Amino acid sequence: MDPSAPQPRAETSGKDIWHPGERCLAPSPDNGKLCEASIKSITVDENGKSFAVVLYADFQERKIPLKQLQEVKFVKDCPRNLIFDDEDLEKPYFPNRKFPSSSVAFKLSDNGDSIPYTINRYLRDYQREGTRFLYGHYIHGGGCILGDDMGLGKTVQVISFLAAVLHKKGTREDIENNMPEFLLRSMKKEPLSSTAKKMFLIVAPLSVLYNWKDELDTWGYFRVTVLHGNRKDNELIRVKQRKCEIALTTYETLRLCLDELNSLEWSAVIVDEAHRIKNPKARVTEVMKALKCNVRIGLTGTILQNNMKELWCVMDWAVPGLLGSGTYFKKQFSDPVEHGQRHTATKRELATGRKAMQRLAKKMSGWFLRRTKTLIKDQLPKKEDRMVYCSLTDFQKAVYQTVLETEDVTLILQSSEPCTCRSGQKRRNCCYKTNSHGETVKTLYLSYLTVLQKVANHVALLQAASTSKQQETLIKRICDQVFSRFPDFVQKSKDAAFETLSDPKYSGKMKVLQQLLNHCRKNRDKVLLFSFSTKLLDVLQQYCMASGLDYRRLDGSTKSEERLKIVKEFNSTQDVNICLVSTMAGGLGLNFVGANVVVLFDPTWNPANDLQAIDRAYRIGQCRDVKVLRLISLGTVEEIMYLRQIYKQQLHCVVVGSENAKRYFEAVQGSKEHQGELFGIHNLFKFRSQGSCLTKDILEREGQVEAGIMTATTWLKEGPPAHKLEMPRQPDCQECRGTEQAAEPLAKEACDLCSDFSDEEPVGATGIKTAKNKAPDSSKASSSPGQLTLLQCGFSKLLETKCKAVEDSDGNTASDDESSDEQPTCLSTEAKDAGCEKNQDSLGTSKHQKLDNILNPKEKHIFYKSEKILEQNISSKSDEKKIKNTDKHCILQNVTESEDSDVICPTQYTTERFPDNSIRFKPPLEGSEDSETEHTVKTRNNDNSRNTDDKRNGIISKKLSPENTTLKSILKRKGTSDISDESDDIEISSKSRVRKRASSLRFKRIKETKKELHNSPKTMNKTNQVYAANEDHNSQFIDDYSSSDESLSVSHFSFSKQSHRPRTIRDRTSFSSKLPSHNKKNSTFIPRKPMKCSNEKVVNQEQSYESMDKFLDGVQEVAYIHSNQNVIGSSKAENHMSRWAAHDVFELKQFSQLPANIAVCSSKTYKEKVDADTLPHTKKGQQPSEGSISLPLYISNPVNQKKKKVYHTNQTTFIIGETPKGIRRKQFEEMASYFNSSSVNEFAKHITNATSEERQKMLRDFYASQYPEVKEFFVDSVSQFNNSSFEKGEQRTRKKSDKRESLIKPRLSDSETLSFKDSTNKISQVCSLKTYKRKSVKFQNHISYREEVFFNDAETKKSPVSSTQEIDSGKNSQASEDTVTSRSLNSESETRERRLENTMKDQQDLTRTGISRKEPLLKLENKKIENPVLENTSVISLLGDTSILDDLFKSHGNSPTQLPKKVLSGPMEKAKQRPKDFWDILNEQNDESLSKLTDLAVIETLCEKAPLAAPFKRREEPATSLWKSNEKFLWKKFSPSDTDENATNTQSTT
């Protein structure tokens, strides 16, 4: 090679660039044929043409144009003159990998910066996008955060960005450019000065520091130096001389060398694991913020690990000031989001939280980029993630309880109470700062928390030597106190410490682990066993040694060079099938793809640690499906740790993922008012020794809400309920088999059957447990202003019990009162049944009609009368009684304006009650994760359909029995979970979900059906299981109860299996239905005994899961299992609730204080829907009356004054009714100041509670102080309005009622026509005043008035109806900020109570006739009693004062939409002169009292004590009524002076 020759830059057709020394094909000087030669030098002539001096094999030289040279195609045997060719020198180059994309550079900008083709060919699209994101912020001189999930290649994206900015090519050219400058000059190649000036600093944890260097060396030719260890001073000199391009250092070294590094000019600072910058007060945060570089790039997959303050800290480092100050961020984002995430949040809290979430996401969107693992789902195997709750051994329980009973723990628990010395300070800050040994409460708190964690894992851990003398002293004292009760254990520990530590009998988890390892060894599974505690790893290691298992161990003490050796041995050696790994030490940089079972022996407080541990095996390169088992000690502090993980992960989903995450908890981290079930020392130092599972209770509670929402959603999508849905009701009527194909499309439209949840049904072991679990929900739901109605408290059982005789006689439920349980959104089974029922007579003519068609009420009545209920195989009388008591009525939900507008209204019209054991449901197994899958309905003959059903559906078809009923009900519930994902990381195809779901519903006594199941994989997707509906909800937990509740044992929920473990099908079931399996990411309860469901493609995997299920089923210490895959994230039901909360609060400005779990329709939506539904049925020339469309929204301060008037004085003109909203708000604030209120909110509350006269006087005084002449016509305006509105309103009401009657009559039966007509009259009376679009008085403010209009009839007494200001803001400009107060919960309750006073008589009549809620509350004089059997049944006679039950019976005809009745404003005092009734017990909010309500005898006693004349007595003697008499008396008698009660309304109370 001639070093003086000019460098080649000419391009040829064969190759872009030629270099001296390269081999080529050149024309032979003899015959012109191409032959091999080598380039000696390259020259350029005078004309600019490039020539190469080539040297042939015979040493001849010849000058040939570069264009004639061609590249040599190497052959294996071809001799090489050079050691490396260009391909060998390319970086990166993975010869065994195919290029994912073409080998072209990826252009980032027009100035020439691009990702070199050597790197770009291995990148995926999302990685190029990430590189472009980093480059964009670098160009603009700002920072950013790359927040991709673990395993998506953040390191590669950064390297791509560096290669582009440093103009790397990944070829020989980079080698030449990296040569020293004197060599470059000798080659007559000038170094690029611009590139030389660029220098980047990468800060990373020590554990991954050298991994960064390896990656940089692999992916390109970078000049890298490592600033760490002994050589950091020498390397720092090189950095100062700018002899490197990239400097690598650690957080600690950066802190030590901050001044030196700040003296250099860095092009950008890149920080790996940026979530370390999470504490504003931490030293590492201060150091990072002190770096003098504006381009700060952070890399983290978990930017939010514990709270939102961490997010702010990281973002404030990368982009200072982006999210404001810490105080501003907490007020604007953190508090609203966290409070809106509460399970008991109000609509305003939820809507405000979601709005804050969206604002935060919008604010961060340009500076924060996050992608999830769904991008690489096709490269990852399946993951089965399960929580395994292990019962403690008796010895563990005793020790755990003993620790909690120590004096120190008592001191901790009482530390926050007021000191006994009455100083006003807390005990821990006054007389009880330390214990008798001088240890502070804080020290004791942390020490005893550690002790409880040790006992929950293995009692022998208390005997282990501690790391510090203080800890050792404390542990010794605790052991002396605790083990004084167990001398045998202490003696054995001294004599045989090794044996004690390795003996599983001292730990419930160890017993489970022992059988798990044996199971994995048989199946040749390789197990990664993680533990956070190294002391616990010692115990596990000793167990492995005692068991003769070949294992490896890796923890923080393992040297770095040995780590890779251990990983390699474990992955490659078959004999080593267990590796003990420390959760923290093994969290980063380890690749255990050889393992397919991951066991987390103990949880950590930070969910990111556990996820990192799982990702050691579940990552790209894993060939087998991964099973993750997390062991949790039941009822201990570990359960709180896991639930806090869920809390943090849900918060991460909201803030980082901008998802409407499910709201499981009532707790808010850092809030003393909302410690809920998670936070506070009382939750940590608690032991649930009865075997109950807090996790199960919380997930079930959320599942009930979700199920109710989604069930209502299905109803709301079904259209006008005017037609029949053909479905045979009789249990022995055979289903037609030729309709499978026709039924398939109905899968998308049928009702969602996975929400058959009933709070009144027994949970776990006893029915009393249910009451205890649900009572707190009731009280917390009413924590917002408003008292729960009996509708929300599950009151239907009492009414149903009294009507049992009628039900048994004619198959029709006479009582039409219904309940939706404590959870307002939880619907009973019949709600779904009603949407899916078919008329038996129509079976032969039409098999599967559209689900828009609902059985006509008249036809239902006739049908039920002619049908005999078949009570099938009830095991005992107590069972029958319990089943009847658990029956509920359905709540048919209203229809909204679109399919996505799904709401739940607590008071809607109902369908008839269904006979037991008659309906079968067939939920389809097909469904995508993003679309709601609903379910069709079928029936089948119990006697004749066994063969066909078995072959088609793969279920056990026997004659209906408690066992079989239970099986089918459980199958049905689990079968509906196909809408959910299989993994929080991965989307699973529909077929996989089908198989997995079926495989997870297995029972011990159904092996005989497995062969049949393997015959129909295709049919299963279409025709799935047929299930019992009523038994489904009756036996949601088990139909087969024994005489003692305590003996009921369920495999997953029987927490004391030693004494209760019957091996029967009925008792070996798991109740997945308690969780909302309909939703995308919901938790599911995993049954113990799997039932095979075959598909050839995944049969091996299913067998693997079945094998694991079978193993877990046989472990006695496993108390409860649930899948962790669908717990985290959002759901469709939560999306509905969030959307409607925002709609109600921000658009309609109403219902803001209702619980967020209740969705409410607007009158606008209702009107549009009713117009669409009613118009086709209207006769020619007849329009639907306005009164029949409007809703009776009862508000305590309605606005009736809607006239627009103008008053003229000498110099001033006053316009009434057209005040702009801005002026209204402004003058309302002035009014608050005028009346010396401390705030606008206080003034709004004062107005709400003030009497009519007080409000009138306040308005007059305020405006008269500015305009004295206002006082003259102020009152006249009101009185004028009152008179005209009363007269005209009554006339218009009657006209509209007549129209509505003629409109509805053709579709109703005789009795229904009459009752509906009355309801129409009543509705019209409420809403007819809406026609008078009188505007509010405008004195540069919005003045509104209110009146109560009484409609009296000579024969029938009507209720006082308060006309409301029109909610439809499009109709009335007065729907403004002022009206929000009138929509507040207290106001609504007040008016509703006024209405109730005068409706007692009609309510009695209604109750006697047993009319459903499709029928009205008010009756005309010509009432007809449809069912004489119930004529003498009076709810008033049963309960006493039943006026509070008004909304139970309130209905508005066949209208598809109905606003809910408002809950009461608060608990009311019981009158002294009457006995305690049902409502008094509910007001006590006492778990014990509420649990009594499940006892039929108690309810009967209450009914007997109830006074009969209470409602009439109230009218005569208000002072002795249910409510106290005072200035704020809710049912105050009407007087003309009340018309001045219309004060200016504000949105403050909302």
Swiss-Prot record:
Coiled-coil ranges per UniProt: none
Helicase ATP-binding domain segment(s): 135-321
Reported modifications of this chain: Phosphorylated by NEK6.
Location(s) in or outside the cell: Nucleus; Cytoplasm, Cytoskeleton, Microtubule organizing center, Centrosome; Mitochondrion; Chromosome, Centromere
Effect of substituting residue 787 to A: Affects centromeric localization. Affects localization at sites of DNA replication
Pfam families xrefs: Helicase_C, SNF2-rel_dom, VIGSSK
Motif extent (DEAH box): 272-275
SUPFAM superfamilies: P-loop containing nucleoside triphosphate hydrolases
Domain of life, source organism: Eukaryota
Chain segments carrying region Disordered: 1-23, 808-848, 914-1002, 1354-1410
SMART domains: DEXDc, HELICc
Keywords: ATP-binding, Centromere, Chromosome, Cytoplasm, Cytoskeleton, DNA damage, DNA repair, DNA-binding, Helicase, Hydrolase, Mitochondrion, Nucleotide-binding, Nucleus, Phosphoprotein
PROSITE patterns reported for this sequence: DEAH_ATP_HELICASE (PS00690), HELICASE_ATP_BIND_1 (PS51192), HELICASE_CTER (PS51194)
Gene3D superfamilies, sorted: P-loop containing nucleotide triphosphate hydrolases (3.40.50.300), Tandem AAA-ATPase domain (3.40.50.10810)
GO molecular function term, any single one: DNA binding
Modified residues (Phosphoserine): 980, 983, 1373, 1376
Composition bias, Basic and acidic residues: 12-22, 830-840, 933-953, 1389-1405
Top class in the EC scheme: hydrolase
Residues annotated as binding ATP: 148-155
Composition skew (Basic residues), residue ranges: 992-1002
Reported tissue expression: Expressed in bone marrow (at protein level).
Family: Belongs to the SNF2/RAD54 helicase family.
Disease: Bone marrow failure syndrome 2: An autosomal recessive disorder characterized by trilineage bone marrow failure, bone marrow hypocellularity, learning difficulties, and microcephaly. Insufficient hematopoiesis results in peripheral blood cytopenias, affecting myeloid, erythroid and megakaryocyte lines. Cutaneous features and increased chromosome breakage are not features.
Subunit structure: Interacts with NEK6. Interacts (via an atypical PIP-box) with PCNA; this interaction facilitates cenrtomeric localization of ERCC6L2. Interacts with CYREN; this interaction is DNA independent. Interacts with XRCC6 and XRCC5.
Function (record text): Promotes double-strand break (DSB) end-joining and facilitates programmed recombination by controlling how DNA ends are joined in a spatially oriented manner during repair. Also plays a role in DNA repair by restricting DNA end resection in double strand break (DSB) repair. Facilitates replication of complex DNA regions and regulates the maintenance of chromatin structure.
Name of the protein in question: DNA excision repair protein ERCC-6-like 2
Species in which this protein is naturally found: Homo sapiens (Human)
Lineage of source species: Eukaryota, Metazoa, Chordata, Craniata, Vertebrata
Gene name tied to this protein: ERCC6L2
